[in-house]
Amino acid sequence: MRRVFKITFTVVVAIVLIFSISSCTEKVPKIPELVTGFSGNADVELGETKLKCNISHTEKGVSSIIISSPENLKGMSFKNLGGTYAISYNELICETEKSYLPSSCFAQAITNVLDKASEENGAIYQKSEDNNAIFTGASKSGDFTIYADSKTGIIKKIEIPEINFTANLTDTKAI
């Protein structure tokens, strides 16, 4: 009887030890996939300039940015059609096969960051904090930080400190 008790006790202790050791392993957080194909609105600050715009961007690099505020620029659009670029305002359209916008232009900065983030390893996950997944990378417009929803991967904010650029995105939906 004592022998059966010792064997049973040893088995129970072994099982408890196995479960306690396995529960101590650190759980690696799931890294969200960054969603670069989306449409939404953005409040943009570039130095002293403040703009509101509508943004649409695909993972293939096709983008459209239309200014909605200030009133004197309302309706101006910047489009990258995957090799063809177009700027339009009040029925005036300039279309070219090369982007002539400087990399510090707000529309070019947004496009540069989103295009880079669409590339494999173009935006590197750094950490998660306050329900934000934080990604960093380098684009033609400068080093950037992207804040995305840690569950959905939808971009909420883009920063490029070198050109004093911030874009806060709202009403964003994956496309």
Model-derived regions, located:
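N-terminal leader/targeting segments and the immediate start of mature chains
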Residues: R2, K6-I7, F19-V62, N72, ...
